[in-house]
């Protein structure tokens, strides 16, 4: 039960990994997981939260892996972008089935499949209460979907980038391998870099830091965690500028 009557955030960018959609499966999309995530997003919409979503594509394709096997990295990344579009289509469909208005925008044109990304239109849709799913990353190779999440978050003026992962925050070490690893509740950008903690890739993280975009890492597989994050309850790890953490 939340101790805060009002949501802590009004406009968010939710970053989900493609792997999160797999559930217990080794590949693809688990329909049960997809529907549960759609229901959790629906709860936010009902609270009046404006929700942007970026989904990775690792459950369907990883360009980096095939690049190591000899495939051209640009080609591999283009295939990875298309994988995020497939995940976006699945999420849009799940949201529609949950009676949530959602729009899918792609950074690469896919006429007849989804809309082209348009910054002004995205903000207008968010203000009207629609969920906006941003697909195809940034539209450029060599850029991760974490970079896309931070970029879109900054563009739509989100108050925070929520990074849904398999662990419930940022730890001093891998909690799976080291049971004595310590979980951080709040950190500054500099502290994360100093400790070399792997929150997201460096390009994405420094983009967020340079534009003072807070990042909140939490466990998306934990039922109710997303709502608790939104309500400002102690959930996950919040990373923001050190001057704010000191206040």
From Swiss-Prot:
CDD domains: AAK_UMPK-PyrH-Ec (cd04254). InterPro entries: AceGlu_kinase-like_sf, Asp/Glu/Uridylate_kinase, Uridylate_kinase, Uridylate_kinase_bac. This is Uridylate kinase. GO terms for biological process: 'de novo' CTP biosynthetic process; UDP biosynthetic process. It comes from Shewanella loihica (strain ATCC BAA-1088 / PV-4). Belongs to the UMP kinase family. Pfam families: AA_kinase. The lineage of its organism: Bacteria, Pseudomonadati, Pseudomonadota, Gammaproteobacteria, Alteromonadales. Gene3D superfamilies: Acetylglutamate kinase-like. Keywords: Allosteric enzyme, ATP-binding, Cytoplasm, Kinase, Nucleotide-binding, Pyrimidine biosynthesis, Transferase. ATP binds at residues 15-18, 58, 62, 165, 171, 174. Pathway: Pyrimidine metabolism; CTP biosynthesis via de novo pathway; UDP from UMP (UMPK route): step 1/1. The keyword Transferase applies. Allosterically activated by GTP. Inhibited by UTP.
């Amino acid at each position: 039960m939340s101790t805060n009557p009002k949501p802590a955030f009004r406009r968010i960018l939710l970053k989900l990994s493609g792997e999160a959609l797999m559930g217990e499966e080794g590949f693809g999309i688990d329909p049960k997981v997809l529907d549960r995530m759609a229901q959790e997003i629906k709860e936010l919409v009902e609270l009046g939260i404006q929700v942007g979503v970026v989904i990775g594509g690792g459950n369907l394709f990883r360009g980096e892996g095939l690049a190591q096997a000899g495939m051209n990295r640009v080609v591999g990344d283009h295939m990875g972008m298309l994988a995020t579009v497939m995940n976006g289509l699945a999420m849009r469909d799940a949201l529609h089935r949950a009676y949530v208005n959602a729009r899918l925008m792609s950074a690469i044109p896919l006429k007849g499949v989804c809309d082209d990304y348009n910054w002004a239109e995205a903000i207008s849709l968010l203000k009207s209460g629609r969920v906006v799913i941003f697909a195809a990353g940034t539209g450029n190779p060599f850029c991760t979907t974490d970079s896309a999440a931070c970029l879109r978050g900054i563009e739509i003026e989100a108050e925070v980038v929520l990074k849904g992962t398999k662990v419930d925050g940022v730890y001093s070490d891998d909690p799976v391998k080291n049971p004595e690893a310590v979980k951080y509740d709040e950190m500054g950008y500099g502290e994360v870099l100093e400790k070399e903690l792997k929150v997201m890739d460096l390009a994405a993280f420094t983009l967020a830091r340079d534009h003072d975009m807070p990042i909140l890492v939490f466990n998306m597989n934990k039922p109710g965690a997303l709502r608790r994050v939104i309500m400002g309850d102690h959930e996950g790890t919040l990373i923001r500028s050190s001057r704010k953490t000191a206040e």
